[in-house]
């Protein structure tokens, strides 16, 4: 492993005096410090994941900044600063000459979905910024922070290139609507990138002006989520969209220095979602009825783990919550145990031919950190057998760096 100088702590002192580092949304800063020390010592426990992270960050250094104004489609507003995407499962109606209005085929992606660049460019920007920010924080190499800052300025800050802070035209459906509340699932990746934004605070490349500008964008966006009809419509959804909505509101509020908003969302809104989503058997019927029941149910529960992490930062123990039928998140996680520990076959044949293990990996990390750290290796072996997905490498996953399980 190449030797690297660890500079972020010194930079934070020089730039911010003795002020305490800003609160992270989903990551434990003490864990990051432990991982950073392990990286410095070339600890074999973190080396595969760290090397993979640096490799991705190096590739991100070569990436051209993406600007939403370069999208090939023009939103109904006529303003290419507006985000626009299409519902992935909507197809032309073969019984209609013009195919309109489109009809839904759950789980089947229409290739037209990929022709609208907004979503893909947002995801690429967020993923690159995550890799670059984490790499900077763990190595102290300013080149990573500098590139992350460049990508963020182009996508969110520069008036000439930035995205407008709304999703008015998210997940449109030809012949039906130009945008929907559930389009806000597209920005779940943005909520997951908040910690990467916060970690850049100690960098010389990310200025106070940059931070203020990005906070202003995020604040405007999440206020739009709370107050616009499209945003409120998403907030009324019962399923994974509600989980993603709450997670985003909480993460954005924390980034904007408004933890009381996150606290209010958790206590006054999120808790009630448990009554809707989790029946007495601790399953997730709203997700399990989908054509990709494994993917949707584990994705939704992973969103809840993000809410658990945020609750931890705010001193709110979501694990202790029980809904009106007495079900807790602990029981919802344990609903999967017969499958991942005992090899019980999945109850239905999904449209997807693979069971992605990434979501259940993070779920079990958060669960084991709370209840049984020593059992995590057992869960990993069970997940490997049940999902049978060789493309996912547990050893190189960034979760090893962000959510380490020490048992």
Residue locations for each model-derived region?
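Bacterial N-terminal signal peptides that target proteins for export
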Residues: 1-7
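Bacterial N-terminal signal peptides
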Residues: 8-17
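Long, repeat-rich segments with strong aromatic
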Residues: 244-347
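Short, contiguous, pocket-lining structural segments
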Residues: 181, 185, 189, 210-217, ...
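Exposed boundary/loop context
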Residues: 9-10, 71, 288
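Extracellular glycan-targeting catalytic surfaces
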Residues: 18-234, 267, 279, 310-313, ...
């Amino acid at each position: 492993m190449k030797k690297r100088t660890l500079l972020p702590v010194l930079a934070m002192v020089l730039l911010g005096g003795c002020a305490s580092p800003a609160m992270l949304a989903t990551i434990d800063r003490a864990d990051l410090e432990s991982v950073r020390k392990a990286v410095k010592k070339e600890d074999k426990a973190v080396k595969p994941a760290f090397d993979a992270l640096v490799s991705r960050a190096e590739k991100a250094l070569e990436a051209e900044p993406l600007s939403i104004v370069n999208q090939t489609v023009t939103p109904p507003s006529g303003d290419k600063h507006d985000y626009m995407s299409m519902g992935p499962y909507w197809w032309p109606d073969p019984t209609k000459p013009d195919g309109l209005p489109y009809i839904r085929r759950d789980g089947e992606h229409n290739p037209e979905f990929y022709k609208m660049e907004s979503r893909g460019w947002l995801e690429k920007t967020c993923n690159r910024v995550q890799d670059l920010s984490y790499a900077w924080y763990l190595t102290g190499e300013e080149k990573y922070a500098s590139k992350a800052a460049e990508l963020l300025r182009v996508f969110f800050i520069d008036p000439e290139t930035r995205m407008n802070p709304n999703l008015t035209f998210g997940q449109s459906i030809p012949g039906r609507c130009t945008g929907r509340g559930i389009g806000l699932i597209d920005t779940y990746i943005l909520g997951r990138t908040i910690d990467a934004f916060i970690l850049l605070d100690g960098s010389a490349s990310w200025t106070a002006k940059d931070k203020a500008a990005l906070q202003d964008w995020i604040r405007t966006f999440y206020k739009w989520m709370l107050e616009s009809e499209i945003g409120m419509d998403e907030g009324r959804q019962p399923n994974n969209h509600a989980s993603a909505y709450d997670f985003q509101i909480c993460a954005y509020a924390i980034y904007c220095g408004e933890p009381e908003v996150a606290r209010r969302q958790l206590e006054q809104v999120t808790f009630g979602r448990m009554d809707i989503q989790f029946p007495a058997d601790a399953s997730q019927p709203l997700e399990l009825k989908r054509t990709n029941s494994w993917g949707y149910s584990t994705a939704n529960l992973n969103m809840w783990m993000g809410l658990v992490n945020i609750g931890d930062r705010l001193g709110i123990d979501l694990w202790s919550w029980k809904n009106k039928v007495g079900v807790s998140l602990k029981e919802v996680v344990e609903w999967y145990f017969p499958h991942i520990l005992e090899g019980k076959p999945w109850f239905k044949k999904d449209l997807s031919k693979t069971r992605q293990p990434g979501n259940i990996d993070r779920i079990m990390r958060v669960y084991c950190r709370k209840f049984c750290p020593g059992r995590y290796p057992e869960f990993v072996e069970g997940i490997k057998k049940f999902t049978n997905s060789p493309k996912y490498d547990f050893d190189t996953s960034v979760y090893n760096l962000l959510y380490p399980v020490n048992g």
